[in-house]
Regions:
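Elongated periplasmic alpha-helical coiled-coil
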Residues: 25-27, 34
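Non-catalytic connector elements of ABC transporters
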Residues: 28, 39-210
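Short, small-residue-biased leader/transition segments that mark boundaries at the very start
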Residues: 1-7
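Short acidic-hydrophobic catalytic motif
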Residues: 8-12, 20
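Phosphate-coordinating loops and pocket residues in cytosolic domains that bind phosphorylated ligands
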Residues: 3, 12-13, 24
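Internal, well-ordered alpha-helical scaffold/interface segments
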Residues: 17-20, 123
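Residues located in well-ordered beta-strands
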Residues: 18, 32-34, 143-145
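Short glycine/serine/threonine-biased micro-segments
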Residues: 1, 22, 151
Length: 210
């Protein structure tokens, strides 16, 4: 897989969107993003209905090369498939390879299973944020509203509303949360995942700041 050196098959570095969704409890937060890479290697992204965020890869990344490698791998795969299809006795796969349709948690849920997919470009990404990396912090620049809270022993699983979107976080300690309270949020650590929306593959991991 393209980018496999940066995205190992572990909890925090899955190879693609499907694996990221499958691994972990509570489930990962998927956030659609749109943006470009700057000269310093970072990406300025528009997320969560219009907010601006800065993603910095943990390792050096040249996105244009990554996209070129992705396209070359896809072309080779298509050529190999065409060659196999020409062989006698070839049976086409019933489960054709398709990009995993991830779920975006929203306050007002919609059934988009039959919706037509928008045109995806190289400026379209998906961020993967594990709940343990969403923190309530006084210095946080992201504002959210407590939408739900479930104490589970030494930690609490919280649902936070940001605009029309819902994010899941895991907060350690015995704090009590009041529904509707506004809280400052930050995304911690350097294991925030950046996925290619076109292929579903993990590009790299890094930090995310608002």
């Amino acid at each position: 897989l393209v980018g496999s050196e940066m995205c190992k098959e572990t909890d925090h570095h899955p190879a693609n969107l499907f694996v990221a969704d499958f691994v972990g409890n509570p489930s990962i937060n998927f956030v659609e993003a749109k943006g470009k890479q700057a000269a310093d290697g970072s990406l300025t992204l528009t997320v969560l209905g219009g907010l601006t965020a800065r993603f910095r890869p943990a390792k050096a990344l040249e996105l244009s090369k990554w996209f070129a490698d992705r396209d070359a791998a896809a072309a080779k795969k298509a050529a190999d498939l065409k060659e196999k299809a020409a062989q006698k006795g070839y049976v086409e796969k019933g489960n054709k390879d398709e990009v995993f349709r991830y779920h975006i948690a929203k306050v007002d849920e919609e059934d988009d299973s039959l919706a037509e997919l928008p045109e995806i470009t190289n400026e379209d990404f998906v961020l993967g944020i594990r709940p343990e990396f969403l923190d309530i912090a006084d210095e946080g620049n992201l504002r959210g509203e407590i939408y739900g809270a479930m104490p589970t022993g030494m930690e609490s699983t919280i649902k936070v509303r940001v605009g029309g979107f819902l994010l899941t976080g895991v907060v350690f300690g015995s704090s009590l949360f009041t529904i509707g309270t506004e809280v400052p949020l930050s995304v911690t650590g350097d294991q925030i995942m950046l996925f290619d929306r076109k292929s579903g593959q993990c590009i790299t991991s890094g930090t995310l700041n608002f």
